């Protein structure tokens, strides 16, 4: 094995250190045997991470994860005041992957490969050194997966979710609801997301696209109101809560503390907040580059044309938030389930992109295009 960071393999404490024990950091660490480094460590914060349900459309890089999914749905809906659109895909069913299950799996694989897992808070880094609350560590190569702060004013996908247990069977366990816009639209682009695990148990999230995060009470009231209005649920048990905020924009790449990967390295799809499949794609490309003897280099998992389309789309919905339900309805109506899954995972070809463009109302997008300078 060779040290990509320096010719003298004994000069550093570790040949490579991964900062951050989240999805990107541990997804890389679990494949340490494919890296051209001898001694590898992961530094992760001491704080216990909140368990999240990750929504995943499968792609070529998610096979190991999809087999661990809590549940998959071959049918899903987009619902607006215009009606409900049901899409289906047996090839790319929508999956719910629990973060705890995946991260535990990655840690186990990493440990089995001899990766050292270190708990600590990183306070500073240089090209080859990392300062933590327990002292300094040196490394030939540093990978940094910690999320950057979301810039003020950027659109954010923010949400609170409750996994609920109903007293009677009210959910359709064979059909997920990815977006239901029949809820309070006064605070931004707001929809309810429902993943039914059984006829009586489901994850229900209140999600908003806007630059402003609301008080918890707003999301929780929206969940209760929705369950009462559309499922007749007034008495429920909350089994679990989750909360999050995801940037909806192209974040500036930060190479100051090592090679950025994951959200820090631009893996989040701006228009959707989808990240898991793109993180796996980014890591696969990074490993292939290293295995071929090339130096580590940041690699975006997105195509430039998709990022360009996302920029225009985000500008349109930010300037016209009330138009958003119509746009998502139109896209769902124009695409098959397979098409939707391909588009969301970045596997679209030009014909599919054209389908999406043709489904959209032209005037708002032309205005956004002219204002963006093309």
Task: For each feature predicted by the language model, list its residue ranges.
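FAD/FMN-dependent oxidoreductases across multiple families
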Residues: 184, 210-289
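N-terminal FAD cofactor-binding segment of flavoenzymes
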Residues: 27, 31-82, 160
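Predominantly flavin-linked oxidoreductase catalytic cores and closely associated redox partners
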Residues: 113-234, 249-254
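N-terminal Rossmann-like FAD-binding beta1-loop-alpha1 element of flavoenzymes
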Residues: 5-41
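A conserved beta-strand/loop capping segment in the N-terminal third of enzymes
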Residues: 59-120, 125-127
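Conserved Rossmann-like nucleotide-cofactor binding loop
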Residues: 24, 48, 123
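Redox-cofactor binding/interface segments in oxidoreductases and associated redox assembly factors
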Residues: 19, 143-145, 260-262
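C-terminal helical "tail/cap" subdomain of flavin- and related membrane-associated enzymes
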Residues: 284-374
């Amino acid at each position: 094995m060779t040290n990509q960071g320096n010719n003298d393999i004994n000069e550093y404490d570790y040949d490579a250190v991964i900062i951050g024990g989240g999805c990107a950091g541990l997804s890389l660490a679990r494949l340490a045997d494919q890296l051209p480094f001898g001694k590898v460590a992961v530094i992760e914060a001491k704080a216990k991470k909140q368990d999240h349900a990750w929504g995943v459309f499968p792609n070529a890089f998610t096979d190991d994860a999809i087999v661990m999914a809590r549940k998959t749905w071959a049918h899903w809906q987009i619902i607006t005041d215009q009606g409900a659109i049901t899409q289906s895909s047996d090839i790319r069913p929508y999956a719910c992957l629990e973060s705890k299950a995946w991260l535990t799996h990655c840690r186990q694989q990493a440990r089995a490969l001899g990766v050292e897992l270190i708990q600590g808070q990183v306070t500073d880094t240089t090209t080859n050194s990392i300062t933590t609350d327990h002292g300094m560590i040196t490394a030939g190569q540093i990978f940094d997966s910690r999320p950057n702060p979301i810039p003020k004013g950027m659109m954010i996908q923010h949400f609170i979710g409750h996994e609920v247990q109903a007293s009677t069977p009210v959910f359709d366990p064979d059909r997920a609801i990815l977006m239901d816009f029949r809820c309070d639209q006064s605070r931004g682009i707001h929809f309810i997301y429902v993943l039914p695990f059984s006829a009586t148990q489901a994850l229900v999230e209140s999600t908003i696209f806007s630059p402003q995060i609301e008080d918890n009470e707003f999301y929780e009231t929206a969940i209760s109101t929705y369950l009462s209005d559309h499922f007749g649920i007034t008495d429920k048990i909350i089994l679990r809560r989750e909360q999050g905020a995801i940037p909806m924009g192209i974040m500036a790449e930060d190479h100051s503390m090592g090679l950025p990967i994951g959200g820090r390295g631009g893996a989040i799809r701006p228009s959707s907040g989808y990240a898991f499949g793109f993180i796996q794609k980014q890591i696969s490309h990074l490993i292939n580059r290293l295995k071929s003897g090339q130096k580590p280099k940041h690699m975006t998992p997105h195509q430039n044309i998709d990022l360009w389309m996302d920029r225009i789309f985000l500008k349109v919905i930010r300037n016209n938030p009330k138009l958003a339900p119509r746009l998502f309805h139109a896209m769902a109506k124009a695409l098959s389930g397979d098409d939707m899954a391909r588009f969301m995972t970045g596997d679209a070809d030009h014909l599919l992109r054209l389908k999406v463009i043709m489904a959209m109302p032209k005037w708002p997008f032309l205005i956004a295009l002219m204002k963006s300078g093309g």
